Structure formats: C-alpha cells, structure tokens
Amino acid sequence: MDNIDVIEELYNVILDRKENGKENSYTNYLFEKGIDKILKKVGEETTEVIVAAKNTNKDDLIAEVCDVIYHMVVLMVEKEVKLEDIKNELNKRRKKVGNKKPERRKIENI
C-alpha cells in the first residue's frame, strides 16, 4: 500500500465506524459525543502540532500531525465531506497560477 492509500483507508475505516459502530472504539466515542467533542479534539491536536513544531523533536511533530489528520478525517465524515471532495479542491488549487494573497496586517498591529 502506498502512502496516499493509507489516508483513503483511514477515511474508509472512520466512515465504517460512523455507519456501523464498534464497541470500545475511540472513533465511535467521538461520533457519539458529537460535533462539539470532535471540534474540541481538532483544536487540541492543532495546538499540539504548533507546540511540537516549535520544539526540535521531529518524531513528536510527525505524531502530532498524524493526530490532526485523524481528527480532521473524523470531522470530514461527521460533516459528510468526502475524501474525493478534498482531492478535487486540492487539484483545482494546484492548477492556479499567480494566486498569492496580499500581505496581511501583522497581528501585533491590530
């Protein structure tokens, strides 16, 4: 299995948990708790990526990025966003040329 397929497999497993459930499944637990719990986990894990990126341990960063991807896929399934939707959007974006956004004001100046 190549690396791209692992994300598709992850999506399919999470979708199956949503549709069929599985006893003692963390994924099932998230779906049972609902969107607020899922969003809380996405926020927590994203913060952990930021902290890990500031530190020097690459393995910690990799682990935290994987946690974010997992929780984002749970969110996608909860909101009925298909993996194909994401792939299509990414393909559209990579074809754009000259799409640099204007500089934003620094947060310190707000």
UniProtKB/Swiss-Prot annotation:
- Write down what this protein is called: Phosphoribosyl-ATP pyrophosphatase
Provide the alphabetized UniProt keywords.
Amino-acid biosynthesis, ATP-binding, Cytoplasm, Histidine biosynthesis, Hydrolase, Nucleotide-binding
Q: Which cysteines are joined by disulfide bonds?
A: none
- Where are the membrane-spanning stretches? none
Family named by the database record: Belongs to the PRA-PH family.
Q: What is its EC number?
A: 3.6.1.31
Subcellular location per UniProt equals: Cytoplasm
Its BP terms in the Gene Ontology are: L-histidine biosynthetic process
The answer to whether UniProt assigns keyword Cell wall biogenesis/degradation to this entry is no
- Coiled-coil annotation reads none
Give the pathway annotation. Answer: Amino-acid biosynthesis; L-histidine biosynthesis; L-histidine from 5-phospho-alpha-D-ribose 1-diphosphate: step 2/9
Originating organism: Clostridium novyi (strain NT)
Q: Which reaction does it catalyse?
A: 1-(5-phospho-beta-D-ribosyl)-ATP + H2O = 1-(5-phospho-beta-D-ribosyl)-5'-AMP + diphosphate + H(+)
